[in-house]
């Protein structure tokens, strides 16, 4: 089979009735498809929205709440109810499911990242289907992933999935908004995510959830840079998940980078928090960006920030001002200042294994989303 390990993301609009409440029939349809794929030998992860939709009615709200506290309370109730729906339906097919609630901290903190990766690996190896959502009942903006499109991409990269499928109410990326532009055409295969692709994503998508088409392009960037291809397709067909796994569903396919980022490089690229800035000369800039070399102390022109040994810093080309990438330093700021002042700068500040170059696609990720 081409895609053994698959991460599916199902959004709010794919799980709810017209009044915004949870549709048990839609949940049942999803679990039936998961069961069929599981029985065919696939390893599956489901990133599922729907906690607020499942819980607001039980708390007496007439419609989906808008206040943060009301939404968090609804999510707290709904997480259990939603998982019960998934668990009950999957157990009918003798399939075990597991709930994992994540926040951005679980990706930023390397220890927690490792723990989450290990837990998911055990679940997959034991034949369980992890059902993942952001921990909406307690999460705050500072540690919030923000949408389940992004979360699903981060999870797919973490477990080195063979495919990420983003199910939505639009059957792929169009050249315009298919709801208002009759000339809009679906892009079936996207080799590179650039500004033109981002501009195309601006108008399409659903207003029911927090993840429109633009967030799906962000997710596709994270996943494809990590070596995971992405398929955006419609959830409206009863067998859309099965067809996506078999590549027979209509949609948009985003090609993965041939040499995707491994775990350490993913962490550096997407999650590591920079504690300072380093400016380098032309020779060092070329060595880093074009030849994959380590950053030598002799190439450093200037340093800024109160960083310590082992911290992450951002490196800039002094001549152009362009950001080159991020890396883990072998000297703290004060020690580096002494070395540079002594004019005996020999040795390495950042080893190439602790370095990630910022590609145009990753740069767009930081500046456009």
From Swiss-Prot:
Entry annotated with the keyword ATP-binding: yes
Gene3D superfamilies assigned: Acetylglutamate kinase-like, PUA domain
Pfam families: AA_kinase, PUA
Pathway: Amino-acid biosynthesis; L-proline biosynthesis; L-glutamate 5-semialdehyde from L-glutamate: step 1/2
Record-annotated PUA domain positions: 275-355
This enzyme's EC code(s): 2.7.2.11
Listed name of the protein: Glutamate 5-kinase
Origin species: Streptococcus pneumoniae (strain Hungary19A-6)
